[in-house]
Each structure stands twice: as structure tokens, then as C-alpha cells.
């Protein structure tokens, strides 16, 4: 079970970017600097065109009242334990972890709050800081050591319908950052479940994460109370204090992609430069052509996730 750690003396009195809505305060650097205003939310909120309200409870709970939640007996554990005894995501980066859904126990479950299958729902467990980078605007870094597999933060914001996504993208200029992310999950019957999240105006600290071609975070959809997944970011390796946190905007990192998803990411003509500095840097940020209306081609004022 999560507990709020004591705030380090050096962080006391500093701006809390999270406005007191997270387990731990999120400081900003340099002192006196403050990111552009936005409405903070630690969780998804329903936006225009959303197919489902992420705040509604749609999953039944397990009946593990007197026994621990284990695969085969707990309805929330479909295949195997999601986390180990240290609250680390099991087999992170493996093909199985990228293809099997992750369900945590929820508010209707009869198991204890100390259940090992409750991790993402407890929020921030490490001190994070929003900071000004040299070439990428604002970024997010950790002030603590983060072991491989531990949950770091969510990417939370407005859950949108595709028409609203395309409308918002069309209004962007080449100089605007696009925070909208499209998550596509290929289910057993060949269908694709799409989730669109935009934290530009309403979101959490995940909006400050920059792209890297060799990131230290991996995004995994995690479901708790609703079919709308939480976009949970886990440490793909051990992360040292003051390291910038990043993930791969394209979803390619440690993940198998379907051919149609690769095509969506490769069709873009206009690309923003990538400043991640990785040895395998692709030189340009990923571009998702599906965010544009299929009947229209983006002109010089439009760009994908950046």
C-alpha cells in the first residue's frame, strides 16, 4: 500500500506543479520558473466525443476476502501476477507483457488495500521535478532512484473521440506541441480498441514527458475501475536521480507493432527534429498520420505528437 513520504527539506516551500493533488509534491526548476497554466488532474476526465466516462466503475470486484489475490482464483488476474513482491511490473519489456492486458484490483474488490495487485492506483511514489531543458522546452526528471519495473506516473488528460482529436490537431501550427496520444490495442477477435488522450489543457505531469528514441520509461495500458485504460509509465531500466524521464511517442520501444500501426507512423511528411541525443536517434519525432482527417492532408501548419 502506498504511503506519502516526507517531503525533503530542499523541496519545502517550492511550487507544487501538481497543486497538492498527488501523493507527493512535484517541484519546478529553476526556482521562480513556472510552466504554462493548465488545469491539473491526476486522473483521466471525459472530454468531447469520449465513448466512455473514465470515472465510472464498470468492472466487478474480486471475491478474495480471506485469501490473497492469485492467478486462477482472483478474477482480476487473468494470466499471472502483474507485479512482484517489490511492486515491480513483472517481465517488463517482454513480448508477453506487451500483449497481455493488465488489470488491477479495484474499489469493488474484497481484497485488502495492501493487495499486491494494487500499484498504479496509489499514484506517485517517487519525487519528480518539472525542469527547463536546453532544446525541448519543459521536461520531467526524477529526484530519486527508480528501480526497473517500478511505476513512475500516468499520462492523464481528457479522453476524446476521434472527431474531436482531428479537430484539435487541425487547429495546431507547426510551432505548437501536440500532446494528444493514440493508444491502439489489438484484441483477440481482430478488432482494435482506440483510446485518445489530450493533457494539453487538462492533464497531469505526464504532459511534460519528452520523447526519446532510447527511453527509460515504457507505457502500459492498465485497467482498474473502467474499460478506459490508465496510461501507466513504468521504469524500463534502473533510473538514477536527476535523470530526465522519457518514453517513445511511437510506441515502438520494447513493443511489437502491427503493420498498419507502423504505416500510420511512417506516412508523415512534415517532421519535427528530435533532440533526444540517443545513439539510435531517428533525427525526427514520430508522426501519427491517423490523427488527421483521412480526406485531408496536413499542410505546413500541422504536425503529429511532438
Curated annotation (Swiss-Prot):
S-adenosyl-L-methionine binds at residues 136-138, 179, 207, 210-211. PROSITE patterns: POST_SET, PRE_SET, SET. The keyword Transmembrane does not apply. Its main location: nucleus. One of its GO terms (molecular function) is histone methyltransferase activity. Residues 270-286 form the Post-SET domain. Gene3D superfamilies: SET domain. Zn(2+) 2 binds at residues 62, 76, 105, 109. InterPro entries: H3K9_Histone-Lys_N-MTase, Post-SET_dom, Pre-SET_dom, SET_dom, SET_dom_sf. Zn(2+) 1 binds at residues 62, 64, 69, 74. It catalyses: L-lysyl(36)-[histone H3] + 2 S-adenosyl-L-methionine = N(6),N(6)-dimethyl-L-lysyl(36)-[histone H3] + 2 S-adenosyl-L-homocysteine + 2 H(+). This is Histone-lysine N-methyltransferase SETMAR. It comes from Bos taurus.
Amino acid at each position: 500500500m502506498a504511503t506519502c513520504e516526507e517531503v525533503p527539506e530542499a523541496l519545502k516551500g517550492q511550487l507544487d506543479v501538481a497543486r497538492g493533488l498527488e501523493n507527493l509534491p512535484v517541484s519546478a526548476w529553476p526556482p521562480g520558473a513556472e510552466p504554462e497554466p493548465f488545469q491539473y488532474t491526476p486522473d483521466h476526465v471525459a472530454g468531447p466525443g469520449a465513448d466512455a466516462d473514465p470515472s465510472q466503475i464498470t468492472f466487478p470486484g474480486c471475491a478474495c476476502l480471506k485469501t490473497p489475490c492469485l492467478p486462477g482464483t482472483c478474477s482480476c488476474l487473468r494470466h499471472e501476477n502483474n507485479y512482484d513482491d517489490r511492486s515491480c511490473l513483472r517481465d517488463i519489456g517482454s513480448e508477453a507483457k506487451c500483449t497481455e492486458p493488465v488489470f488491477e484490483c479495484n474499489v469493488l474488490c474484497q481484497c485488502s488495500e495492501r493487495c499486491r495487485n494494487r500499484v498504479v492506483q496509489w499514484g506517485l511514489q517517487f519525487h519528480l521535478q518539472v525542469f527547463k531543458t536546453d532544446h525541448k522546452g519543459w521536461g520531467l526528471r526524477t529526484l530519486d532512484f527508480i528501480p526497473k519495473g517500478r511505476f513512475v506516473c500516468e499520462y492523464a488528460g481528457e479522453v476524446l473521440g476521434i472527431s474531436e482529436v482531428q479537430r484539435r490537431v487541425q487547429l495546431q501550427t507547426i510551432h505548437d506541441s501536440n500532446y494528444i496520444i493514440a493508444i491502439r490495442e489489438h484484441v483477440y477477435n481482430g478488432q482494435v480498441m482506440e483510446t485518445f488522450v489530450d493533457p494539453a489543457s487538462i492533464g497531469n505531469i505526464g504532459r511534460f514527458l519528452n520523447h526519446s528514441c532510447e527511453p527509460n520509461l515504457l507505457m502500459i495500458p492498465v485497467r482498474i475501475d473502467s474499460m478506459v485504460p490508465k496510461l501507466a509509465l513504468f521504469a524500463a531500466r534502473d533510473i538514477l536521480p536527476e535523470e530526465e524521464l522519457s518514453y517513445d511517442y511511437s510506441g515502438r520501444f520494447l513493443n511489437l507493432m502491427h503493420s498498419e500501426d507502423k504505416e500510420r507512423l511512417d506516412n508523415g511528411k512534415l517532421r519535427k527534429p528530435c533532440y533526444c541525443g540517443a545513439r539510435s536517434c531517428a533525427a525526427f519525432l514520430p508522426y501519427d498520420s491517423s490523427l488527421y482527417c483521412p480526406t485531408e492532408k496536413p499542410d505546413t501548419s500541422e504536425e503529429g505528437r511532438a
